[in-house]
């Protein structure tokens, strides 16, 4: 993914499950950061109440790469998926107590609005700065149901060419180059 993003100069997504798997991306994220490569890291995560209780391979994923990102988007957990489990362990306080079922749609809409904004900001930052971003997605199990279309409208970005050109006086450079007794050429990323 890093090589593809480098070649096409557009964001490329990498996706992983939660826990230790996410940490395996750190070398690529650091390289993308210092090489100006727009990498989008999408990670699944456990619900907040499952973190720091010894649940297998569960780590604090929010902002784990912040020193090498231009944007970190910790999304909010859906409240309509597996509501009974959320209510049973309402440590993350996603649903207010006492709970009124008619509030659920309004609460979910607020989550959707927040998540859509975070996704948009992350993708915009990756494109604008040509650097990596991280979108962390908490999910409640079970994850058996599927959907036919996304519930968040993804933004459409216009293609802006940000190719940088460097110009120098070619005659002056050629003259200087030809007079030099020793020459060194350094090649690297700009």
Where are these regions (language model features)?
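Short beta-strand segments
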Residues: 15-17, 38-45, 76, 134-138, ...
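Short coil/turn connectors at secondary-structure junctions
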Residues: 8-12, 34-39, 68-70, 129-132, ...
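Glycine-rich, acidic loop regions that bind phosphate or pyrophosphate groups
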Residues: 32, 43-122
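Short acidic, glycine/serine/threonine-rich loops at helix termini
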Residues: 2, 25-27, 51-55, 84-88, ...
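Conformationally flexible catalytic loops at phosphate/diphosphate-handling active centers
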Residues: 90-109, 113-121, 125-180
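Thiamine diphosphate
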Residues: 1-51, 154, 159, 166, ...
């Amino acid at each position: 993914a890093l090589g593809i993003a480098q070649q096409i100069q557009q964001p490329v997504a990498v996706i992983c499950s939660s826990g230790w798997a996410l940490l395996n991306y750190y070398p690529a994220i650091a390289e993308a950061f210092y090489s100006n490569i727009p990498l989008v890291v999408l990670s699944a995560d456990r619900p907040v109440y499952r973190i720091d209780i010894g649940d297998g391979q569960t780590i604090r994923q929010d902002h784990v790469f912040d020193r090498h990102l231009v944007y970190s988007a910790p999304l909010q957990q859906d409240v309509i998926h597996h509501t009974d489990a959320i209510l049973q362990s309402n440590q993350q306080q996603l649903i207010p107590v006492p709970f009124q079922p008619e509030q659920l749609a309004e609460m979910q809409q607020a989550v959707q609005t927040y998540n859509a904004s975070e996704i948009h900001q992350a993708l915009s930052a990756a494109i604008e700065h040509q650097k990596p971003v991280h979108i962390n997605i908490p999910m409640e199990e079970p994850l058996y149901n599927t959907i036919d279309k996304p519930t968040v409208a993804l933004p459409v970005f216009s293609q802006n060419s940000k190719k940088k050109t460097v110009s120098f006086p070619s005659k002056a450079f050629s003259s200087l180059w030809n007079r030099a007794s020793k020459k060194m050429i350094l090649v690297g990323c700009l």
